[in-house]
Each structure stands twice: as C-alpha cells, then as structure tokens.
C-alpha cells in the first residue's frame, strides 16, 4: 500500500538446455534474487539472495508477511515477516512439494489461506502451512500462473 513493488527474477527464458521459451542469454548478475523497488528513493534492492530459483511471490492481506516460492531443485514456499520499515525477518519453510511439482502463481484469500498452482492441481494451505484443500485437474495440464477470481479473494 506504500507503493513498494516486490518481485522475483528467475532465469526462465534465458537459461540454456531447458525447454522454456525466451531468448538464451547470460544472467546480468550473480544469482536469482527477490527485489524490492522503493518509490521514495527510486531504488531497487536485492532483499532475498539465498534461494536458487525464487519464482512466485505474494503479500498477505495485512501486508505483514511475504510468501515466496522456490522452483529450483527443492520446491518450497518460504514465508517472511515484514516489519514496519519493510525489512524481512524470520523466514520459515511454509510448505514443500515433491520434485515434479512447482509452486508458481498464488494468492491469499480473505481468511489468509494461500491458494497456489502446484503441478497438475491447485492446493490451498491455511496460515499454519497445513494443506486444507486440493483441486485436481480433470486432465493433464501444467498450471503455471494462477489467477484466483472468486468471492473469497479481494
């Protein structure tokens, strides 16, 4: 709500030897990071540098938590607390998936449950990281970006 923009910069589209669209090239810096743009200073800062493939990202409704997915060798969701100065702390592994499934697009609903695409299904986790629902797709699809448009989300 303060105008900050939080984003990930995975290498998809430039990495070689993968069946991913885009234009192969070199990474412009030493890794895949999570960044925050500060509109007050017009600056960008790498705020998470220890994930191998940060990908999906979402803020909780009250903007006190940031959720980030890792789509590298180990697939997991990591949750951070956000303090009043917009600094991250207390990272926890929120949920983990098997190597075939990737958390990608996700969003919090009004009850702060997290709905995420995950392999060939949509999975819902409560605030404790417990899986509380799963929606299996009727046929084989690859879910990537997930947009949730229901009366459960704002």
Task: Show where each model-derived region lies.
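A detector of repeated loop/turn-to-beta-strand junctions in beta-rich toroidal repeat architectures
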Residues: 24, 28-32, 74-76, 88
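Short loop/turn segments immediately following the C-termini of beta-strands
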Residues: 10-12, 71-72, 119
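Short loop/turn segments immediately following beta-strands, especially the blade-tip
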Residues: 79-87
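A short beta-strand motif characteristic of beta-propeller blades
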Residues: 42-49, 90-96, 130-135
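Beta-rich, blade/repeat-based domains predominating
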Residues: 1-5, 28-33, 46-65, 97-119, ...
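A short loop-to-beta-strand structural motif that recurs across blades of beta-propeller domains
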Residues: 32-35, 76-78, 121-123
């Amino acid at each position: 709500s303060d105008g900050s923009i939080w984003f990930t910069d995975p290498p998809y589209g430039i990495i070689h030897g993968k069946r991913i669209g885009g234009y192969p090239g070199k990474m412009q810096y030493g890794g895949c990071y999570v960044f925050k743009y500060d509109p007050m200073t017009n600056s960008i800062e790498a705020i998470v540098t220890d994930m191998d493939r940060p990908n999906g990202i979402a803020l909780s409704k009250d903007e006190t938590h940031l959720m980030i997915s890792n789509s590298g060798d180990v697939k997991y969701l990591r949750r951070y607390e956000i303090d009043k100065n917009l600094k991250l702390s207390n990272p926890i592994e929120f949920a983990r998936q098997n190597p075939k499934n990737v958390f990608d697009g996700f969003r919090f609903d009004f009850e702060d449950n997290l709905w995420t695409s995950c392999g060939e299904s949509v999975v819902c986790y409560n605030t404790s990281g417990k899986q509380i629902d799963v929606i299996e797709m009727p046929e084989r699809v690859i879910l990537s970006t997930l947009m949730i448009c229901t009366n459960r989300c704002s």
